[in-house]
UniProtKB/Swiss-Prot annotation:
The keyword Glycoprotein does not apply. The lineage of its organism: Archaea, Methanobacteriati, Methanobacteriota, Thermococci, Thermococcales. It comes from the Archaea. It comes from Thermococcus kodakarensis (strain ATCC BAA-918 / JCM 12380 / KOD1). It catalyses: RNA(n) + a ribonucleoside 5'-triphosphate = RNA(n+1) + diphosphate. This is DNA-directed RNA polymerase subunit Rpo12. Its EC number is 2.7.7.6. Belongs to the archaeal Rpo12/eukaryotic RPC10 RNA polymerase subunit family.
């Protein structure tokens, strides 16, 4: 049972989905099919040349 947290592109709410048993991937709040995985807020250091 692999649950993953996604964010809805339309309403912005976080949705937890079980991808093993989910028949369709939709936001339960607004019905949008566009969900994306939120990126962690980690600052990355880039070495200057």
């Amino acid at each position: 049972m692999a649950t993953a947290v996604y964010r809805c592109a339309k309403c912005g709410k976080e949705v937890e989905l079980d991808l093993a048993t989910a028949r369709e991937v939709r936001c339960p709040y607004c019905g949008s099919k566009i969900l994306y995985k939120p990126r962690p807020r980690v600052a990355r250091r880039v070495k200057a040349i």
